[in-house]
């Protein structure tokens, strides 16, 4: 589960990490009030779960409370990558000398919490990994004792914080970040940038936190932070229908039963020269209504040029899936070509149901992927 920036900021503050002052506004007048309380220049930031807010005009500087009100009026209601801005964070504008990066993430290779730091903050860490990988410092926390003091100090020294006072403060922040990661059952806690102010002190200027949804039952206070309005409409509908759906950037929609088979399907589409438009797992035992909902979600993406059904009927009955596809197509007529690879329980009945439809049959996954790629290109 993603947290908004203001929620992440407040959570880090609970662990003793220095953060910017400010507050959240849902109206321009509230933004003006918060700016007046700060008493200086402020940054008004759109609170939506997407990157690229600044480039989209969702982050603006305001010198006065009146200007903060004007800026908030411009940002509130703005559409950024399909999400409507309903809240803005009004935070104090801070001058600084350096931008650093610090995060904690679960490293599945070492099966430990990996602490990552870099002297090149303020930009996407993935970009730093491409352009200057040596600037990224990684240290795994001890599996039972956590992040040790000497490890935190080593991170500080290796990113150029040679001043003793700065190194100690960085070590304290790194240790607090690790505690936040573990105690909140997070999958990512990131400060980017962690800035060095003019007086030499450190401050978390922007932050990102991802929580493990499977562990939220242990944290009702964190679960309460979930904002349904901040997630894309398709993902919200999928969650309500009990479907696992993640939108991607391709043009071939996928409906698969089982997460492993869904990932394999995406891989084969890529190997066939195509790009998957989504990850979608309808789960085991999916009935007609669930299949219908899944297809409607896939077709709601205007980028989808073809759909590939890859169903292996173990618990899931192939004829039930076929009925769901037919029912969905009756309610949502579409010209999008569809390829179906249906095998397993009641597959003969399922294929018979689809025989009179316009679906393109495929005997194997490889054949299905190749036909879906060709259909997306308009070659079928």
Swiss-Prot record:
Succinyl-CoA synthetase functions in the citric acid cycle (TCA), coupling the hydrolysis of succinyl-CoA to the synthesis of either ATP or GTP and thus represents the only step of substrate-level phosphorylation in the TCA. The beta subunit provides nucleotide specificity of the enzyme and binds the substrate succinate, while the binding sites for coenzyme A and phosphate are found in the alpha subunit. ATP binds at residues 45, 52-54, 94, 99. It is an enzyme of class 6 (ligase). Substrate binds at residues 257, 314-316. Residues 9-237 form the ATP-grasp domain. InterPro entries: ATP-grasp, ATP-grasp_succ-CoA_synth-type, ATP_grasp_subdomain_1, Succ-CoA_synthase_bsu_CS, SUCC_ACL_C, Succ_CoA_ligase-like_bsu, Succinyl-CoA_synth-like. GO terms for molecular function: ATP binding; magnesium ion binding; succinate-CoA ligase (ADP-forming) activity; succinate-CoA ligase (GDP-forming) activity. It holds the Pfam family Ligase_CoA. Heterotetramer of two alpha and two beta subunits. It catalyses: succinate + ATP + CoA = succinyl-CoA + ADP + phosphate; GTP + succinate + CoA = succinyl-CoA + GDP + phosphate. Binds 1 Mg(2+) ion per subunit. Keywords: ATP-binding, Ligase, Magnesium, Metal-binding, Nucleotide-binding, Tricarboxylic acid cycle. Its cofactor is Mg(2+). Mg(2+) binds at residues 192, 206. Its EC number is 6.2.1.5. This is Succinate--CoA ligase [ADP-forming] subunit beta. Pathway: Carbohydrate metabolism; tricarboxylic acid cycle; succinate from succinyl-CoA (ligase route): step 1/1. It comes from Chloroflexus aurantiacus (strain ATCC 29366 / DSM 635 / J-10-fl). One of its GO terms (biological process) is succinyl-CoA metabolic process. It comes from the Bacteria. One of its GO terms (cellular component) is cytosol. Gene3D superfamilies: ATP-grasp fold, A domain (3.30.1490.20), ATP-grasp fold, B domain (3.30.470.20), Succinyl-CoA synthetase domains (3.40.50.261). Belongs to the succinate/malate CoA ligase beta subunit family.
